[in-house]
Amino acid sequence: MLKELRIKNFKGWKDTGTIRMAPISLFFGANSSGKSSIGHFLMMLKQTVESPDRKAVFYPGGKNTAVQLGSYKEIVFHRDPKNKISFDYCWELAETLKVKDPISDMIFSGNALAFQAEVGLDKKDQQTLILDRLNYEMLENDEKSLAIGMRRKSENRLDYIVESVRYKLKRKQGRAWYPAATVRFYGFPDEVVAYHQNADFVQELNLNHEKLFRSICYLGPLRTKAERLYSWAGNEPESVGYSGESTVAAILAARKRKISLGYKKTAKPFEEIIALKLQEMGLIEKFKVNPISEQ
């Protein structure tokens, strides 16, 4: 779960300041005060994590995504391409993360991770989006156990320097190569592991970051128009979709699932519960599903 969030130079925000997050966080303000931008930013990061393009620093969205934010110039503060979007957040881990240095045999542990990054346009062409730096901190009860990150070696090149605090990285013998492009906005590339003797744990950091954003869900109105006919090929969708486009498939996939509506109450089939709730809302009189083919 996110504990803190801070965003700089995103849409109408020069600096949000540190926002403390809770299981339920509510934002109040006048129209166009920037409330929605905070959610849009998180959804953009989620879309980027889930995007198949590992080299895309940000994925602002497309036809079937929660948000469509446009180009970098449309999302950066004051639409000034010289501004860089920076952000940091901290989140609790479901399980304690332990890192053992195979060289020193020291063990580092943490129950939370903090992340910072800065993104901007390449100074050469003012078109290419580039990650200038990223940094992870592993925290144990709010105390830093270790930190590791990457920053660009030069503004004119895409080579990165890997730096660490409280954890001594040891390079493998041979020429001192530098890692190239990062994985999206958050990920250490494979070269970091390949060039060092004790950097395997960075893959765990990548994985925990992806788990964080997979746990963040977009809640919004279902706006897909109802259709007369729906086809279902037996697939089991992960959700109903951002616009409800997979609602029918989700219902059909859960036909054999039973849910209890309370303590010591009989579990009922998923379809029956849907029908019951729709009737309680006065939206239907009858709910029935008949297969038109054996599948």
Regions found by a protein language model. Name each.
Residues M1-A66, S71:
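Pre-Walker A-like glycine/lysine-rich segment at the N-terminus of P-loop NTPase domains
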Residues V49-Q295:
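Phosphate-coordinating catalytic segments in nucleotide- and nucleic-acid-processing enzymes
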